[in-house]
């Protein structure tokens, strides 16, 4: 099986490169800049192609070249392994080979236009010589002057004239200032496909092959030990637990913790799935009082996440002790959780996830995270491979900390119950209207401000709730629904929101105003906290 190694310099979309490569049927892994690829090669580990990611830093700040870059280019010279540098990776290549890289006079962010001045095997069938093409840029530095010796310019920025694409055909080294991995670059997927063809990669990576590999990896990692699985009824933990159960059978103990912060009827959904449909035993722990006690008076979202993460692990450690010889804790952590927590060497932290940055530094259980390198859409594909019902796989994502991060400010029992009912009305009406399956994620947020209203002949002073609905494929970027829909569809959704607003205000005491969140990701995250 071919392998593409992606060197992560801290871009928030690095994992999209891995996802695009996998979509094209080639296995990919993400490595930190400190990786010793020469040592890996000496141990017989074969890498078929390298991709250097973007990142938030500047090559002007470098004191020497990262080990991984030296290794990558030495392996390119010795073994002819193709290399593609993207954005910061492109600047790194230019810097390594002697070009001057400095801050641009005019920085480029978002859509940009390029003039195609030379053909390239990367752009074959994608760009036409002499054409003007649009791409997605996000950079502050550019090559100043000429490209390095041995390289030629394929495309320049139409606005600034800066080099946007250079290549060294003899050594199969390619550098692009733009981001072919994002959906906003037309033809980006085809360019990556051409790069994989140049590398001679075999297209044999599928969810079936991933499943086979992971079963072996789980067996090896657990080494006969028992595993306690943290399940929530959501897509991620459901797929992860079924996968681990397939690998180790009865050595897996499933535990469902009712934090008091879950969706309405969640415990029943979990019992129906795992006990009724999958014939897996589940221990149900009602720890709602403990979580509410720990969260009392806390307003800061990062502190809330840390408390939930620490309490979550504490509960599982206690349960593991009561169960006997438990050595491992399974969690349904996925790639976007890891990325946004900024746990890589070069990543910029956005927020903690209770499955990642919210974990205490010292644990008495070793983690098993079989989905850690999968995106949400890949998790669903794996779930289908495992035979999970669509009723579970098509559920909207729900955050590990639950409703606590959808209540701005302090979490109280009153606020949790109010938000739970608001969310239930919103989602039930969305299902009834046939909208649910067209939306990637929808939820309600309780805003800790009160506004004046009028109901009947009386004055009210109630909370504001915000409704959110987004479209996405992987959770890394998202548009508010119904962006991109027809005008008729937009009007239908507006009418739907009005019905939901009336239902919430009419049926629930404590809320007298409903607003809709129109923000995309970026600049916002999907969840409010």
Swiss-Prot record:
Active site: 87, 179, 181
Any one GO molecular-function label of the UniProt entry: GMP synthase activity
UniProt key word Nucleotide-binding: yes
Pfam families, per database record: GATase, GMP_synt_C
Keyword Lyase appears in the UniProt entry: no
Residues covered by the Glutamine amidotransferase type-1 domain: 3-204
GO cellular component: cytosol
Domain GMPS ATP-PPase: 205-395
EC number(s) reported in the record: 6.3.5.2
Record's subunit section: Homodimer.
Protein name, per record: GMP synthase [glutamine-hydrolyzing]
